[in-house]
C-alpha cells in the first residue's frame, strides 16, 4: 500500500513539476512579446529589454515563427518608433528586421501566430517602403529604388496589394491629390510611382504622416504641393483647441466661387490635431485647382468632416461642393466599378496574407456601398446588376470574405434585393 502511495505521489510530483516547468517556459516565452506590447503603449518607449528577451528566445527556439515576428517588430521600433523618426531610418537595422520577417514567411507561409498590427508580408512592405521614402526625403533616388526593389525581392510588395493600388490610382482624375490612410495603401503607391512610374501626376498625402514635421516639408519641396505655411511655421504648429465652425474656401481666380462646410473638432471633442491643420491648409490652397480624393470608407474625423460632400467613385471618394443626399438624389454608379478586376492576382497570394485579403475586400465594399444606396432608393434592378457584376469579378473561391459576419451582412442585403427584384 505504501509502495502504491509512493508511486502515486511520485507521479503526482512529476506531473506538477512538468506543469510548473511548462508554465515557467510559457511565461518566459510570452515575456518578450508582453514587454514589446507594454512598451508600444507608452509615449516614450524603450524596446531594449524586449529585444534582449526575444533575441534569447529565438536563439533557444529558432523555428518559432512568433518569436521571430515580434523580434522583427522590436528591431523595427528600435530603428524608428513612429513616423516622426522615419526619415532617419538606418539600412542595417532595416535589413535585420527584414531577416526576421523573411524567416517567419519561410517557417510559416501562412503565419499562425499572434499579429501585432501588420502580417509579415505587409510588414516587409512597410519597413522597406519606409526606408525608400527616407532616401527620397534625402533626394537619393537610386537608393530609394534599390530599397523598393530589395523589399519586393525579400517578400514584400506582393502582387495583390500592388494591383489594388494600381486600380485605386486609376480611379483618380489627372493631377489629383489623394489623401490616404495606412501602410497598406500609402507605401505600395510610393512603390508604383517610383519603380513603375505609374500615375506620378497624383500627389499622395498620408493623413498619419502629415502629423510629422519632415513629411509636410517633403510634400512642399519634393512633391510640389501648395502649402501656405513656411518651413519655420511648420516647425511650430501644434494641436490646438477648436470649436465647430464654418470653413470657407474661395477660388482665387473667380472669387464668386465659394465652398463652405462645418469643421468640427477632430480630437477629444475640443481639439484639432497638427496634421488636420496642415491638411485643412492643403485643401484650402488646392481645392479649386486640383481634384481632391479620399480613399474609400474614410472616417469623418480623418476627412475634415467633408463626408456629406463626398461622391462615391468606387475605391475613392471625390470632394465636391454639393451635399449628396442618398435619400433623394439619384445614385449614379461610377464607371470605375465596371473596370475593376483581380485577373492578375493568384489565389495563393491572397490567402497567405491576411492584409492582402482585407485590402482586396475593399473592392467588395466599393460595390456593396453602391448596392446599399440603390436599395435605399428601391432601385432593385440596378442593385441586382451590380451584385452580379461583383460576383463575377470577385468570386469567393479566389477572394474569400474576411469574416463570416461580413459575409452574412452582405448576404442579408442581397436577399433583400432578390426578394424585391422583378
Per-region residue spans from a language model:
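ER/secretory pathway lumenal C-terminal domains and tails of membrane proteins involved
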Residues: 19-174, 194-422
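Phosphate- and divalent-cation-binding pockets in alpha/beta enzyme and binding domains
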Residues: 187-188
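Bacterial Sec-dependent N-terminal signal peptides
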Residues: 1-26
Amino acid at each position: 500500500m505504501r509502495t502504491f502511495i509512493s508511486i502515486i505521489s511520485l507521479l503526482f510530483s512529476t506531473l506538477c513539476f512538468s506543469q510548473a516547468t511548462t508554465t515557467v517556459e510559457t511565461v518566459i516565452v510570452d515575456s518578450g512579446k508582453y514587454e514589446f506590447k507594454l512598451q508600444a503603449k507608452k509615449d516614450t518607449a524603450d524596446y531594449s529589454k524586449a529585444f534582449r528577451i526575444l533575441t534569447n528566445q529565438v536563439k533557444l527556439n529558432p523555428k518559432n515563427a512568433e518569436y521571430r515576428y515580434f523580434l522583427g517588430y522590436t528591431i523595427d521600433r528600435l530603428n524608428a518608433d513612429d513616423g516622426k523618426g522615419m526619415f532617419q531610418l538606418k539600412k542595417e537595422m532595416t535589413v535585420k528586421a527584414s531577416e526576421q520577417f523573411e524567416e517567419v514567411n519561410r517557417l510559416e507561409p501562412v503565419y499562425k501566430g499572434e499579429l501585432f498590427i501588420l502580417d509579415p508580408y505587409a510588414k516587409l512592405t512597410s519597413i522597406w517602403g519606409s526606408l525608400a521614402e527616407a532616401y527620397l526625403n534625402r533626394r537619393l533616388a537610386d537608393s530609394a529604388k534599390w530599397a523598393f526593389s530589395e523589399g519586393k525581392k525579400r517578400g514584400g510588395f506582393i502582387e495583390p496589394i500592388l494591383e489594388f493600388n494600381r486600380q485605386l490610382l486609376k480611379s483618380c482624375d489627372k493631377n489629383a491629390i489623394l489623401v490616404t490612410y495606412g501602410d497598406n495603401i500609402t507605401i505600395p503607391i510610393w512603390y508604383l510611382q517610383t519603380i513603375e512610374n505609374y500615375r506620378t501626376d497624383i500627389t499622395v498625402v498620408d493623413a498619419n504622416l502629415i502629423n510629422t514635421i519632415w513629411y509636410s516639408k517633403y510634400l512642399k519641396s519634393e512633391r510640389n504641393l501648395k502649402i501656405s505655411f513656411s518651413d519655420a511655421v511648420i516647425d511650430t504648429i501644434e494641436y490646438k483647441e477648436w470649436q465647430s465652425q464654418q470653413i470657407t474656401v474661395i477660388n482665387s481666380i473667380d472669387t464668386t466661387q465659394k465652398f463652405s462646410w462645418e469643421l468640427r473638432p477632430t480630437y477629444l471633442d475640443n481639439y484639432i490635431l497638427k496634421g488636420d491643420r496642415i491638411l485643412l491648409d492643403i485643401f484650402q490652397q488646392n481645392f479649386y485647382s486640383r481634384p481632391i480624393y479620399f480613399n474609400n470608407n474614410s472616417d469623418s474625423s480623418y476627412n475634415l468632416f467633408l463626408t456629406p460632400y463626398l461622391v462615391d467613385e468606387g475605391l475613392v471618394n471625390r470632394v465636391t461642393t454639393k451635399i449628396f443626399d442618398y435619400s433623394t438624389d439619384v445614385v449614379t454608379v461610377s464607371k470605375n466599378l465596371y473596370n475593376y478586376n483581380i485577373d492578375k492576382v493568384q489565389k495563393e497570394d491572397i490567402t497567405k496574407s491576411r492584409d492582402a485579403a482585407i485590402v482586396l475586400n475593399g473592392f467588395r465594399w466599393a460595390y456593396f456601398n453602391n448596392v446599399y444606396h440603390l436599395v435605399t432608393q428601391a432601385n432593385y434592378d440596378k442593385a441586382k446588376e451590380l451584385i452580379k457584376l461583383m460576383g463575377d469579378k470577385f468570386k469567393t473561391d479566389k477572394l474569400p470574405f474576411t469574416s463570416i459576419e461580413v459575409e452574412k451582412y452582405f448576404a442579408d442585403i442581397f436577399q433583400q434585393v432578390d426578394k424585391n427584384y422583378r
